[in-house]
Amino acid sequence: FLAPHAIVASNTSGLSITRLSEALPDAIKPRFCGIHFFNPPRYMTLVELINTPTTEPKVLDDLEAFVTSALGKGVIRAHDTPNFIANRVGIAGMLAIIKQTEAFGLTYDVVDDLTGKKLGRASSGTFRTADVVGLDTMAHVVKTLQDNLGPDKTPDPFSDMYGTPPVLAKLLESKNLGQKTGAGFYKKVGRDIMRLDPETMEYVAGGAKANEVVGRMLKKPAGERLKLLREAEGAEARFLWA
């Protein structure tokens, strides 16, 4: 039983809300929308609201009012495009970082140090964040982009970037899915955090930090910081500039 005023919503992080609505009775379609909370929802402020062509505007208005006033969240309204806004941008960034990590021969722990608090982001950086999210989940998000974007699909100038990185494919094949399975880009052994060596697919001692010189660069005002990174020759600085 569903009350005639009840709102039906999906928490999908990127599947088409319009396509999901096609399985619903016509009477429910006007009350159906997407409401994407970010994990862990207890702490993450952002919520995406996504309508379909048949969603009544009042449904989104009422949901936004409730989510902001009762739950204290910050709402953005997203179009019904693959992975909406945050995951579309976020996964593109992660894939670019994986590619540049390989190109500059950097290790995952160093890159996490560079892309974490030093850039004003979460201390987990890139690869630790991927482990927490789940590498299988990450792969599903990537596949949503692969299935829906491209020259013969929805145009996206960055669609060539959405290939599955070989290291991710190998981790998925070995069932090392991140934190949920105890191993991914990192693996905890006793009290030690080991990091993956992508060449051997074995875990080695981790905990390396970025070069102190690069760390000092990132503390400079924005203009000076960019100038220093542009002129620097080290792999870590070139990685950040890339």
Residue ranges and their predicted role:
Residues 1-242:
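N-terminal glycine-rich phosphate-binding loop for ADP-containing cofactors
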